[in-house]
């Protein structure tokens, strides 16, 4: 077994607060696969049950906010997480419950993936919840990982270029978050540009675009990968770099399932030594 793989196989724990995806490609299912494949231990608090497949979302069944709080605190009081990944938060009541639970468990490494629209176009959060996320939750997390449409919604700013991405990331910093990773897959071009920004640094990660429709759950996967690397003690920027490499490999080896936007291959990380090259 490669030495670098041994380094990753720590006893770190990642708590995932997100919605369930019945197709298995995104949401809490993708998160668990990612954390487990990268060698850490996944804990969960489910915020909603979504009925969906690769062609779209059929319905969303919300979980009682009180039970979301109980899931987070009861699990964390027994097994303390080293990092938290937050995904789908569809209402103000859910966000308030999550904020209350985060105040209770006091974990530093919190990654927020502001899930707003499913790959097929279905809206996954209401407008009041977006405003609460911007005004309160964003200040409590270590980093946020929006894609371009999500970053546009959060800042009321259109993104057409890499420079626009940087400016929008800086606007998000002004909202109170310390680190921003904007995913650039929605911009056209031979390469995908993911941009990391904090108060002192700007880093552009360039990846050759994989021509495929099978990208369901890439955002969930990236944020969970970043949270996992953070849980192992890696710096934020390095965690972003390794997370992007992991997702890129998972897209390249996708199994081509389903009639729509198919899932990626989370277990490609069994060849995880490639990520460190």
Walk through the language-model features, giving the residues of each.
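Conserved N-terminal subdomain of the carbohydrate kinase-like
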Residues: 2-16, 35-119, 123, 270
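Charged C-terminal helix
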Residues: 11, 62, 237-277
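Short pre-catalytic strand/loop immediately N-terminal to key active-site residues, enriched for Gly-Thr
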Residues: 17-23, 202-216
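N-terminal basic/disordered segments at the start of proteins
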Residues: 24-40
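Short, small-residue alpha-helix embedded
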Residues: 29-34, 153, 212-236
């Amino acid at each position: 077994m490669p030495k670098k793989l041994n380094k990753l196989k720590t006893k770190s724990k990642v708590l995932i607060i997100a919605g369930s995806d019945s197709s298995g490609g995104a949401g809490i299912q993708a998160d668990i696969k990612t954390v487990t494949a990268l060698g850490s231990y996944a804990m969960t608090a489910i915020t909603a049950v979504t009925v969906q497949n690769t062609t779209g979302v059929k319905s969303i069944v919300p979980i009682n906010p009180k039970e979301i709080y109980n899931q987070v605190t009861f699990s964390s009081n027994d097994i303390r997480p080293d990092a938290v990944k937050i995904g789908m938060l569809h209402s103000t009541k859910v966000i308030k419950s999550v904020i209350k639970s985060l105040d209770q468990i006091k974990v530093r490494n919190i990654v927020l993936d502001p899930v707003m629209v499913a790959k097929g176009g279905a809206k996954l959060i209401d407008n009041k919840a977006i405003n609460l996320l911007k005004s309160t939750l964003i200040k409590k997390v270590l980093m946020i990982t929006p894609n371009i449409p999500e970053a546009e919604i959060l800042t009321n700013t259109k993104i057409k270029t890499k420079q626009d991405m940087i400016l929008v990331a800086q606007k998000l910093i002004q909202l109170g978050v310390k680190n921003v990773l904007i995913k650039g897959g929605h911009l056209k071009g031979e390469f995908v540009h993911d941009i990391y920004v904090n108060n002192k640094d700007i880093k552009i990660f360039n990846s050759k675009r994989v021509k495929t429709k099978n990208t369901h759950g890439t955002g969930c996967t990236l944020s969970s990968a970043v949270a996992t690397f953070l849980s192992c003690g890696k710096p934020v920027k390095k965690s972003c770099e390794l997370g992007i490499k992991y997702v890129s490999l998972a897209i390249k080896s996708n199994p081509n399932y389903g009639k729509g936007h198919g899932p990626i291959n989370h277990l490609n990380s069994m060849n995880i030594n490639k990520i460190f090259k």
